[in-house]
Amino acid sequence: MYQSNPKTPFVPGFEVAGTVRECSVDSKFAVGDRVVAATTVFRSGRHGSFGEYCVASENLAYKLPEEISYEAGAAILMSYLTSDFALHRRAQLKKDEIVLVNAAAGGVGISAVQLAKIEGAKVIAAVGSNEKKEFIQQFEPDLVINYQMENLKDVVEEKFGKRPVNVFYDQVGGEPYEEGIRLLSSEGRALIVGFASGNIPSQLLSYLLVKNISLMGVFMISFENEDKEYLERRMKTIFDHYLNKTIKPVYETINFDEIIKYLELIGSRKTIGRIVALR
């Protein structure tokens, strides 16, 4: 859930993998190039990746290495680039810091767990079911919690001590956000990635003040106008991680005519990983 929802009618979708069919004469791309791209432009209201053809800004389009399938590229783009931007650029995560990831079995959460582990951090993965708890174990987080069945604060503090979290990666909002904030250490950093619960929380400003906590917004798409070269470098690093098998995107491929059913599943937060629709 974001603040910049387009007006109807519109073609949904804002990430795609495919082949360049048209580009400007001074483009860094050529017709026939394999690419992944975000088809939204900040504040433009433009989306469109569910269409057979769509338009994308060069600032958020990247050449896809031949060794990476379109399906994997589509699953990687926004999840991993968002998490990399959050952890590397915004939080400046350091080795041995403790990271709490909410919704850790979703596409973005999985990427955050993997990238934090690459940086040498200790990772707490919070999920909403025992199925997801079992699933996320393959990525070797240091602690996994089903917050529907266990008390997040009690379990975390039993293992790591009082208020041990250095970086809190939140894409849920609501009550899980407030619980995570209260686990942050002095000078901790809270990364606000989204509001999957639909509940935009109050900021607990008095708590942020007395604990010297930094609240950081994460909206990678708007950063294209600030430093597109940085995003391009980080995208290359992510592709290298994939080719070196240090990250493993989790996704299910579906036929495009199944997309309504899967959008409903995503909305009910019953999916694991990402859904890639094929045309």
Where are these regions (language model features)?
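Glycine-rich beta-strand-centered segment in the early N-terminal region that forms part
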Residues: 1-42, 48
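NAD(P)H cofactor-binding loop motif with strongest signal on the N-terminal glycine-rich segment
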Residues: 23, 103-104, 172
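Short, well-ordered loop/turn sites that connect or cap secondary structure elements
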Residues: 29-30, 93, 184
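NAD(P)H dinucleotide-binding glycine-rich loop of Rossmann-like/cofactor-binding domains
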Residues: 38-103
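Mid-domain Rossmann-like dinucleotide-binding core that forms the NAD(H)/NADP(H) cofactor-binding site
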Residues: 74-149
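Glycine-rich cofactor phosphate-binding loops and adjacent beta1-alpha1 units
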Residues: 143-213
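Rossmann-fold dehydrogenase core element
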Residues: 186-193, 203-247
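C-terminal hydrophobic helical "lid"/dimerization subdomain
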Residues: 226-279
